[in-house]
Amino acid sequence: QRQMCIRDRCVSEMALAGFTGSEVGNKYPKDPAELKKALDLRGIEICNQWFSSFLITKPLEEVEKEFRAQLEFLKAMGAKVIGASEQSYSVQGQEDTPVFGHKYVMDDEEWDTFCNGMNYLGKIAKEEYGIALTFHHHMGTVVQDPDEVERMMANTDPEYVSLLFDTGHFTYCGAEPLEMVKKYVNLSLIHISEPTRPL
């Protein structure tokens, strides 16, 4: 009951602030009918949901099964985008592990497995569900630094994989977001955050 009150207050305040879209929060109901009812009441639609892929540490069939389940949920919600982040060997959220110099670095074979897997998932999402796969580069993951984003974008099919451009993660890596955004035209979503300046 308390979780429901927190969730309802959160989406109510979003609506009052003028927002008409939301990503799927981790406290949102897992039942699409229940979630849709709560959001429709407030005029809010789902625009995206995080998907944790494990393309270099799990069998592709297992990743695909989890991916399809999430696509079914998003399709029921009327969403058009799914945001994937490769979580194999991720140190994201490990507060005692520095993300610079201590995160996992893929070898060439793992890069091929990862990029081919993203293309495969993106094709499923687009052709079978009408949903676009966008990739979220993230601190502590195998695609964190600008050169890793560049390699991922260069080795995936733009028809099936786009970039979720995150200003905060680029800034944290020492990159200038305005310069980085000029490099990529294949963007589906943008996360705007500034980790170095007080609000």
Where are these regions (language model features)?
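Ser/Thr-centric signal marking residues that sit
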Residues: T20, T167, P195-T196
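Flexible glycine/acidic-rich beta-alpha junction loops that bind and position SAM and/or redox cofactors
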Residues: Q1-Q3, S88-D96, Y172-G174, R197
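Distinct, well-ordered alpha-helical segments
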Residues: A33-D40, T141-P158, C173-K183
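Active-site beta-loop-alpha junctions enriched in small/polar residues
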Residues: G25-K27, F51-F54, Q87-Y89, H138-G140, ...
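N-terminal pre-domain/capping segments
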Residues: Q1-Q3, R7-V81, D108-N119, P158, ...
